[in-house]
């Protein structure tokens, strides 16, 4: 007896094509499957969440910066804030608040110093508790006072720490605790200390005396450097752009071209000088120059005697200027007449 295949039999169903059975696997999937998850160790066991969170907390860095601890004992700081209060008594919360406002070290997240304050209040006999309600001695909100006669003298002095070398803290708190002097906060002390170091001292202004032009100009003429001077500045080789006489605005208006020769013996420059002088001061006639100087070619080389100024004694301009400067010119020094340096 043979049994036929029915449509619901497994053998009767045709097998699907092979390309539909394959799944598309991206590259690197086998590698990712082989790697353990971050919460699993090498053995495949899953780590607890508390261990992972602990590692994350340890990796985080502290972003706050703590100030240096004040170089005083807790006894001294408690006595300081109590004595600076108007009523000479404070609650525990007020003591903690005043100490944190005076010293920035206690403003951070560090809370261990509050236990030290409580311990010093209860262990030192110089601090006395004033009950807010005598019927409730165990109630909170009591006041604390300080008996200054029971404070050890050494407890108020500056302790030897690394902050002591910065000179920001007083050496002794006794004047502020025993005599009632006001104590400034550390921020003000550091600001004043920094300002005292960085602010420069103002030097008193030195007033330069202003001399008379009529007196100072002859001295300028006699003290001009020459090529034969011992010390000549590097910028005296070139001719000056302005004559020293023109630096004085209040000087009498006498043309310097009437009695000073040009720096170079050029005939073109000499003719222009004569035209300029005659146009400016027609009332002063020009006289001919001495022949020994007029015909001398190139008496003043550019690199030698730029400031060597000869004076014409017979020129009217020189006579006019001599009448102005005669009280100031030295009498022992003769005028330079046709001076010509030797060796040229």
Curated annotation (Swiss-Prot):
**Where along the sequence does the record place the motif called SMAD interaction motif (SIM)?**
293-316
Protein's UniProt keywords contain Membrane = no
Specify residue ranges for compositional bias: Basic and acidic residues.
19-55
Keywords noted in UniProt: Activator, Developmental protein, DNA-binding, Gastrulation, Nucleus, Transcription, Transcription regulation
Where does the UniProt annotation locate this protein?
Nucleus
Indicate the residues that the entry says bind DNA. Answer: 69-165
GO molecular function annotation: DNA-binding transcription activator activity, RNA polymerase II-specific; protein domain specific binding; SMAD binding; transcription cis-regulatory region binding
**Gene3D superfamilies annotated for this entry?**
Winged helix-like DNA-binding domain superfamily/Winged helix DNA-binding domain
Q: Where is this region: SMAD interaction domain (SID)?
A: 213-331
Q: Could you tell me the Gene Ontology terms of the biological process aspect for this record? A: gastrulation with mouth forming second; positive regulation of DNA-templated transcription; positive regulation of transcription by RNA polymerase II; transforming growth factor beta receptor signaling pathway
Primary location class: nucleus
Q: Where is this motif: Fast/FoxH1 motif 1 (FM1)?
A: 224-228
Tissue note: Highly expressed in the animal cap (prospective ectoderm) and prospective mesoderm of stage 10.25 embryos.
Has keyword Cell membrane?
no
Name one cellular component (GO) term. Answer: activin responsive factor complex
Q: Where is this motif: Fast/FoxH1 motif 1 (FM2)?
A: 234-240
InterPro entries the record matches = Activin_resp_transcr_regulator (IPR052327), FH_FOXH1 (IPR047511), Fork_head_dom (IPR001766), TF_fork_head_CS_2 (IPR030456), WH-like_DNA-bd_sf (IPR036388), WH_DNA-bd_sf (IPR036390)
Q: Where is this region: Disordered?
A: 1-63
Q: Which PANTHER family does this entry report, sorted A to Z?
A: FORKHEAD ACTIVIN SIGNAL TRANSDUCER 3, FORKHEAD BOX PROTEIN H1
- What does the record say about domains? The FM region is required for binding smad2/smad4 complexes. FM2 is more effective than FM1 and only interacts with phosphorylated smad2 that is in an activated smad complex.
Q: What does this protein do?
A: Transcriptional activator. Upon TGF-beta induction, forms a transcriptionally active complex with smad2 and smad4 called activin-responsive factor 2 (ARF2), which binds a site on the mix-B/mix.2 promoter called the activin response element (ARE). Binds to activated smads and the ARE with much higher affinity than foxh1/fast-1. Acts with foxh1/fast-1 to control the convergent extension movements of gastrulation.
Assembly information from the UniProt record: ARF2 contains 2 smad2s, 1 smad4 and 1 fast3 protein. Interacts with the MH2 domain of smad2. The ARF1 and ARF2 complexes are activated by distinct TGFbeta family members; formation of ARF2 is promoted by derriere and vegt.
Protein name, per record: Forkhead activin signal transducer 3
Species of origin reads Xenopus laevis (African clawed frog)
State which gene encodes it: fast3
